[in-house]
């Protein structure tokens, strides 16, 4: 995850130690990267692991449905850092945990960030295949 962050900042021209630029880029999360739609997702704090897995699949379904309609998304973990403020501002119940934000809109394919490609671990490194 750290490598992805530094790769992203490199694309944006932000070097290590450039605190002001790093903070400015991080703050863009809280404007949903200028997307026209921003969503905050929450989950009841008593729900356990299986529910979190279901929630992840639910979020992925939104991402896939958006793409099928010509839209793009950006899932944003940064929102969970400020869960107390978000809960108060949105009037959310104390039992809800802020999971993430999701920006939704049309991608700017000329933006450097949208040219980023992350390294992927080959499936054989984390999966075991067996013959039936």
Model-derived features: where do they sit?
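Acidic, surface-exposed loops and disordered segments
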Residues: 1-132
